[in-house]
Each structure stands twice: as C-alpha cells, then as structure tokens.
C-alpha cells in the first residue's frame, strides 16, 4: 500500500532504539525498532493498519502534510 504520510524516525539514547512518530495520526501514534530498517517497516505496517481501519469504519483519512517548497538539486 502506498501512502503519502509523514514518518519521522529518530534515535533515542534513553530507549536505545529508533523511535517513530506518525504526526498526521495524532500525538500518540508511535512505534519503534532496534534498527532504522525495522523502525521503518514497523511504521509502514502501522500506517497500513490505521488506513485500513479508517476505511473499514468509513472514517475520513487525515490529510497528508505537504512539504511547503520545491526541492532544489545542487
């Protein structure tokens, strides 16, 4: 499933893992992984569950956050 939602991945020294935030889905939508790849895979799985659940309940999906400007290549 392709989605255009934001996935923020940061290393946590306190937790010794990568912590993931999915900001369009609220303040409490997080997951984690011991590696960056695992954190990303977990985030994609959570997003798929959130999207499927909302669609099954006929609930609107939150709008994706858009990057506010064009990228320029160096």
List each model region and its residues:
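Short, charged, surface-exposed hinge/linker loops at domain edges
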Residues: 1-6, 42-74
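Short aromatic-glycine-(Arg/Gly/Cys) micro-motifs in beta-strand/loop hairpins
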Residues: 10-26
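Acidic-residue sensor for enzyme active/binding pockets
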Residues: 24, 38, 48
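Short glycine/serine/threonine-biased micro-segments
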Residues: 24, 31, 56
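A short, exposed loop/beta-hairpin motif centered on an aromatic-Gly-Thr core
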Residues: 27-38
């Amino acid at each position: 499933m392709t989605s255009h939602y934001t996935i923020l991945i940061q290393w946590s020294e306190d937790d010794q893992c990568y912590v993931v935030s999915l900001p369009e889905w609220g303040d409490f939508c997080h997951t984690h992984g011991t590696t960056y790849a695992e954190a990303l895979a977990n985030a994609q799985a959570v997003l798929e569950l959130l999207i499927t659940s909302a669609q099954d309940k006929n609930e609107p999906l939150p709008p994706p956050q858009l990057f506010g400007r064009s990228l320029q290549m160096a």
